[in-house]
């Protein structure tokens, strides 16, 4: 077996791990946006959260397509344990009378996790087309994070 084959398969395995981790994060994010959106009172925020949930589903599908194109793992649904805990916390806040500010705070925490996941992924050695895709997705996530934060902050000043 040549060294190049080992290096190539190692790089493929690393890419697979990075993409699978991001897919789990995106699944958490998709569910989080949908769950929080269900509890928000502001209609325009509800629409934004539904759109973001759908966008995260699209991001996830793009990454799954890259895995399939490279002949790698099938993705199993599930998300992360941290994501499940975070969503449960958001649901509990909503059920205990959480206002939109508190829900946006929870959403921003989730977006902080997504930002970190993308930063960590882009710190890895990945093929250029994958890096470009992740950079585009990351740019959207940063914009979304800033939108959530600015609306959360605006609710404090009202």
Model-derived regions: residue spans:
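N-terminal/domain-start segments enriched in small and hydrophobic, helix-friendly residues
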Residues: 1-24, 68-69, 78, 85-87, ...
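Alpha-helical bundle segments that constitute or directly flank the non-heme di-iron/ferroxidase center
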Residues: 7-41, 100-125
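Charge-rich, acidic-biased intrinsically disordered regions
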Residues: 9, 47, 54, 74-91, ...
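Alpha-helical scaffold segments that form or flank carboxylate-/histidine-based iron centers
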Residues: 14-22, 43-61, 100-104, 129-143
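Generic structural concept
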Residues: 16, 23, 27-30, 53, ...
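Conserved alpha-helical segments that form or flank metal/cofactor-binding pockets of metalloenzymes
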Residues: 45-81, 148-151
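Carboxylate-rich helix-loop segments that flank metal/cofactor sites and access channels
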Residues: 62-115
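Preference for long, well-ordered alpha-helical segments
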Residues: 107-158
């Amino acid at each position: 077996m040549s060294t190049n084959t080992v290096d190539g398969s190692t790089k493929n395995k690393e890419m697979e791990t990075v993409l699978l981790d991001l897919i789990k994060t995106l699944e958490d994010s998709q569910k989080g946006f949908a769950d929080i959106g269900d509890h928000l009172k502001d209609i325009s925020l509800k629409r934004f959260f539904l759109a973001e949930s759908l966008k995260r589903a699209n991001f996830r599908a793009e990454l799954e397509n890259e895995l399939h194109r490279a002949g790698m793992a099938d993705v199993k649904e599930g998300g992360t344990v941290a994501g499940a805990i975070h969503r449960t916390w958001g649901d509990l806040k909503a059920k205990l009378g959480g206002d939109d500010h508190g829900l946006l705070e929870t959403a921003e925490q989730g977006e902080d996790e997504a930002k970190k996941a993308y930063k960590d992924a882009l710190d890895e050695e990945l093929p250029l087309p994958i890096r470009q895709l992740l950079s585009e997705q990351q740019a959207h996530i940063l914009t979304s994070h800033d939108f959530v934060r600015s609306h959360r902050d605006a609710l404090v000043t009202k």
